[in-house]
Amino acid sequence: DYIRFAARRSFPELKQRHLDDYQPLFRACRIDLGKTTEAADDTTSRMDKIRAGAADPHYTAQYFQYGRYLLIADSRPGTMAFNNHNIWLDDLKGRWRGRWTLNINIQACYWPAETTGLQSTTESLLSFIQDLSASGARTAKGNYGARGWTAHHGTDNWMNTALTDRVFSGMAPHMGAWLVQHLWEHYQFNPDLDYLRRIYPLLKGSAEFGLDMLVEEPTNKWLVSSPSGSPENGMALVNGRGLLHDGTPRPANAVRNTLTQGVAMDNQLLRDIFTQTTYAATQLGIDEDLRAEIAKALPRLPPHLIRDDGTLLEWIKPWKEFDPKHRHVSHLYAFYPSNQITRRGTPELAEAVRKSLVIRDDPAGWTGAWKINLHARLGDAERCFEVIRHMQT
C-alpha cells in the first residue's frame, strides 16, 4: 500500500510532503558551535581528520542533530516506540532479536525529546507503555503476587514483561518505573491536567508494584525491594558467599551473582515514582489511601550510600564487583537522568558520582551517551567533549 501510494505521486511532490512533515520538528532546535574548513569536506574525510586530532565543531553539532533525526524518523504518533533497531533493521533476525531493551536503551533514545523540541515523539512511547502495562499487570500478579504492573529488562512485539534471558540481565523488575519517567518529564514540560489523568494509571500501577515488592532490611530497618538486581552487573561470590570490597582484584574462583535486594537503582527509582505518584494523586484529588501508604514507605527507603573509597554504592552493602569497570552505571541514575543528587544540593554525593565515573568511564558504544550527560551535569566540559570525540571516531 505504501509503494502504491508513493507511485501515484511525483518525486517533487513526495519530497515536499516529506519536508512539510519533517522540517518543523527538525528546526525546533538549533545548535551552533562554529565552523572550521573541515565542514566543507565529506563525512568520511571529516571522521578521518577527527581521528587524527582535527577540531571540527560543526561535525559535533551535526552529531547532536543526527540523534534528533533518528528520534523524528523512528517515533511518531501511530508508530511503535523507538527500539534497538527500528526501521533500520535490515535482517529478519536482528541483534537482541530486534526488541526493546528497557534497562537503558529505550530511555536514552528519548532523552532529547522534551529538551530539543520533539515532544510529539513521546506519544508513541505513551501508547507503548500503556500496552506494556496491561501485560505487566499479569506478570506482577502471577509472578510476584503484587498489585500494579512490572516490566523487566526487555520486551518485544508481544509485550513480554516477565524475566527473560538470564537472571544476570533479566532480574530488573522496576524498569516500568524508569519508562514512566519520560511521561512524567513530558508533564513537567506541559503541565496539563488532562495529560496527567492519562498517565496517572501508569504512575499508580508502578508505585503499587514498588510498594508490594518492599521488605524490611534487618540491620537498619530500611524498606528495600526484593528480589532484584543492578542491571547487567553483579558482585563476586566465592563458595556461595559475597565478598566485600577491599580494593583487591576478585579471586580467580569467584563467580558472578546478580540476584539480591535493595540495589541502589531500585531505591532511586522508587523514590521518584513514589514522589511523583503522590504529587499526581494530590493534583487530581484522588487515592488518599495510596498517598498514605506511600507516605509511610517513602521515608524508610535506604539513603544514597558512599563506599569507603568515596564512590557511590551500587548495592545496599559494599560488595566487591565482579567487573569493577562494567559499562552500566545504573547506580548513578539519581544524578542523571534523575536529579535526586545535584552538585549544589548534595555536593558530597555528587563527588561520589564523579569518583564512580573515574572507574566506570569506558565510553564505548551506547554507554557514551549516558556518560556525556553525567559529565555535563558534573560540569566537566573537558571530559564530556573527550567522550563525544571518542564516540565520533
Positions of PLM-derived features:
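Short, well-structured active-site flanking segments
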Residues: 76-85, 122-123, 190-197, 205, ...
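Acidic/histidine-rich catalytic neighborhood
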Residues: 205, 209-280
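Acidic/polar, glycine-enriched structural segments that form the non-catalytic walls/loops
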Residues: 1-100, 118-123, 129-139, 282-286, ...
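Beta-sheet entry/capping signal
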Residues: 61, 68-70, 221-224, 370
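Extended, hydrophobic/aromatic-rich amphipathic alpha-helical segments that build helical scaffolds
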Residues: 60-74, 176-185, 201, 205-210
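Acidic/His metal-coordination segments adjacent to aromatic residues that form catalytic metal sites
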Residues: 86-97, 151-171, 228-262, 318, ...
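Active-site core of glycosidic bond-cleaving carbohydrate-active enzymes
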Residues: 102-105, 113-138, 142, 158, ...
